[in-house]
Swiss-Prot record:
Main location class: cytoplasm
Entry-linked PROSITE patterns: RF_PROK_I (PS00745)
Gene3D superfamilies found in the cross-reference section: 3.30.160.20, 3.30.70.1660, 6.10.140.1950
UniProt record similarity statement: Belongs to the prokaryotic/mitochondrial release factor family.
Location in the cell: Cytoplasm
PTM statement from Swiss-Prot or TrEMBL: Methylated by PrmC. Methylation increases the termination efficiency of RF1.
Organism: Streptococcus pyogenes serotype M6 (strain ATCC BAA-946 / MGAS10394)
Molecular function as annotated in GO: translation release factor activity, codon specific
Protein name: Peptide chain release factor 1
UniProt cross-references to HAMAP family, sorted A to Z: Rel_fac_1 (MF_00093)
Function, as annotated: Peptide chain release factor 1 directs the termination of translation in response to the peptide chain termination codons UAG and UAA.
InterPro entries assigned to the protein according to its UniProt record, in alphabetical order: PCRF, Pep_chain_release_fac_I, Pep_chain_release_fac_I_sf, Prokaryotic/Mito_RF, RF-1
GO CC annotation terms, alphabetical: cytoplasm
Gene behind the chain: prfA
Length: 359
């Protein structure tokens, strides 16, 4: 099937979806209605671009006819030639855009995510930087209209983040934040540094798609669940009733502790969300490691320990090492205005995928 047949098939399906979504039987079936609505939303941009592309093709045909019929009218002929030139340029742009829109979609792109941030090398400074990254993602989520919920956090004595786990919910969250997994390096003068020397610290970020129970079922026999009293500052027990939950996936040793909520059931539900995502991610990583290099992530190596980005405070500079992007906008990016970085990563990924398809 060539590209035009593919595009026509997408448009035909889009029109079929429009009819289905007005069918009373579909409307009354909430699950099916949501699935079809999601499919329609995912194809809308492709169909809109394809329809605009067909209009450009028609404009080219009309301009060519006009040039043939304009003999003896230099002004009309010149106008038609100019329109033909502009339309041919637009045709090339649409063809590139449509190739990208037809690229196979990551099945996780529309999912919510579990976001984990940890202070790594650098002690207190690494924990403080992990807090900066948390704020950056929270503010970016606000700009996207997403819901950002901190599910579990652990702070150190200077107010930094040793570890934080958050759920980010909304439209196409994974598609935009999936490139954030890896080691984030910071270069700055710590507040405790009297000599003004720049220190280098690292925080790690892990982005995992939320996994529904129907998608990945964990055998209850593979889980060990411990219930204990939640602890407050200084280690004192803050609840008379044991509400905190420790959940261990025995085959992998993956462990989750949850005590943020006031009830045991809510802590258990949140712990289950996280452990399901972590276990699914664990086995997905094993599968990815078994694939050849071409089938690994095109942005970076896919190695979770890979240094992906450096934040240099003295020079107000952010560098993404995977795509060679450097921006003198560190303050802007840390305030949540991440679109320039994320758009560049998406474009790079799409370009590499196109190249691999053409080879």
């Amino acid at each position: 099937m060539n590209i035009y047949d593919q595009l026509q098939a997408v448009e035909d399906r889009y029109e079929e979806l429009g009819e289905l979504l007005s069918d009373p039987d579909v409307v009354s079936d909430t699950k099916r209605f949501m699935e079809l609505s999601r499919e329609e939303a995912n194809t809308r941009e492709t169909v809109t671009a394809y329809r605009e592309y067909k209009q450009v093709i028609q404009t080219i045909s009309d301009a060519e006819e006009m040039i043939k019929d304009a003999s003896g009218d230099p002004e009309l002929e010149e106008m038609a030639k100019e329109e033909l030139k502009e339309s041919k340029a637009a045709k090339e742009e649409y063809e590139e855009k449509l190739k990208i829109l037809l690229l196979p979609k990551d099945p996780n792109d529309d999912k919510n995510i579990i976001l984990e941030i940890r202070g790594a090398a650098g002690g207190d400074e690494a924990a403080l930087f992990a807090g900066d990254l948390l704020t950056m993602y929270q503010k970016y989520a606000e700009t996207q209209g997403w819901r950002f919920e901190v599910m579990e956090s652990s702070v150190n004595g200077v107010g930094g983040i040793k570890e934080v786990v958050a759920m980010v919910s909304g439209q196409s969250v994974y598609s935009k934040l999936k490139y954030e997994s890896g080691a984030h390096r910071v270069q700055r003068v710590p507040v405790t540094e009297s000599q003004g020397r720049v220190h280098t610290s690292t925080a790690t970020v892990l982005v995992m798609p939320e996994v529904e129970e129907v998608e990945y079922d964990i055998d209850p026999k593979d889980l060990r669940v411990d219930i204990y009293h939640a602890s407050g500052a200084g280690g004192q027990n803050v609840n008379k009733v044991a509400t905190a939950v420790r959940m261990v996936h025995i085959p992998t040793g993956i462990k989750v502790e949850m005590q943020e909520e006031r009830t045991q059931q809510k802590n258990r539900d949140k712990a289950m969300k996280i452990i399901r995502a972590r276990v699914a991610d664990h086995f997905a990583q094993i599968a990815q490691d078994e694939q050849d290099a071409e089938r690994k992530s095109t942005v970076g190596t896919g190695d979770r320990s890979e240094r992906i980005r450096t934040y240099n405070f003295p020079q107000n500079r952010v560098t993404d090492h995977r795509i060679g992007l450097t921006l003198q906008k560190l303050d802007t990016i840390l305030s949540g205005k991440m679109n320039e970085v994320i758009d560049a990563l998406v474009m790079y990924d799409q370009t590499k995928k196109l190249e691999s398809l053409n080879n």
